[in-house]
Amino acid sequence: MHSQTRAAVVTGAASGIGLALSARFARAGAGVVMADVEGGALHRRAAELIAEGARVTAVTADLTDPDAVERLAETAFDRLGDIDVVCNNAGVLGPVGQPLWEVPLERMRQVFEVNHWAHVLVARAFVPRLLERGRPAHLIHTASMSAFVVGAGSAAYAASKHADLAVARSLRADPPGDLRGTAVRVSVLCPGRVDTPMVEGLTAPRGAGGDTSVSAEDVAGVVWEALGSDRFYLFSNSDAPLRLRDQFDDVWRHVPLPPPSPEEELWPVPKTTTATTATTKH
């Protein structure tokens, strides 16, 4: 589908992954509507792409406001006509390094409003319009490895990403998701450490190979290659397999399993047999 992507909407498009996605689509010839609450930065980045010859529209929008998101959807369909890709990408890091009881409630609420509530609003505004048109389309939710792996002092961010993962899973096109049997595919993007302004000053995670961080352009490449496919989980960092295995191993250790029945034994013990010698008279 990426070769047929003619129109895309990207939220959180003023910087980081959102900007990289917008640039990837625009440089491939697609029309792009870029949305962000940071209007100044958004319009500067859009102007840079337009100077390259891109077909870009910048829309300043508070994505936590239902009316603003509805206006964004109306503008996007008016400007682009049919839309092939919606990247539900707006996000903030919020407070990190603090235990839950020290995080100001207003800050935690803000993180949930941007990382979760805004994604719900975008899905509610765009998906019905995509279904009405009946054409193939792809909805990309940007979650995080923090939707699976949680560290100390990350309650607000990790909890909001867990919530967004749940929304994406409820929407997915294969059973039992809400979009089963439709032409709208859903994927959830789960990057690890990405070198963007949002994480400047934070310590990069260390893996077996050292620093496992990637660029925003690397992440955009993962999304580009997945467009039109049935891939639901999109991982961008080399340490993802190890981190996921450790997480699910930890879960599995706490699952109370009943003793297997003989039919379920993976390696059943062979039954003992007694040889009988027959004597034949001649």
From Swiss-Prot:
NAD(+) binds at residues 12-36, 161. The active site is at Y157 (proton acceptor). GO terms for biological process: antibiotic biosynthetic process. It is an enzyme of class 1 (oxidoreductase). Pathway: Antibiotic biosynthesis; pentalenolactone biosynthesis. Substrate binds at S144. CDD domains: SDR_c (cd05233). It holds the Pfam family adh_short. Residues 258-282 are annotated as: Disordered. GO terms for molecular function: oxidoreductase activity. SUPFAM superfamilies: NAD(P)-binding Rossmann-fold domains (SSF51735). PROSITE patterns: ADH_SHORT (PS00061). The keyword Oxidoreductase applies. Keywords: Antibiotic biosynthesis, NAD, Oxidoreductase. Disulfide bonds: none annotated. Coiled coil: none annotated. Residues 267-282 have a biased composition (Low complexity). Its EC number is 1.1.1.340. InterPro entries: HdxpentlteDhPtlF, NAD(P)-bd_dom_sf, Sc_DH/Rdtase_CS, SDR_fam. It catalyses: 1-deoxy-11beta-hydroxypentalenate + NAD(+) = 1-deoxy-11-oxopentalenate + NADH + H(+). Catalyzes the oxidation of 1-deoxy-11-beta-hydroxypentalenic acid to 1-deoxy-11-oxopentalenic acid in the biosynthesis of pentalenolactone antibiotic. Belongs to the short-chain dehydrogenases/reductases (SDR) family. This is 1-deoxy-11-beta-hydroxypentalenate dehydrogenase. It comes from Streptomyces arenae.
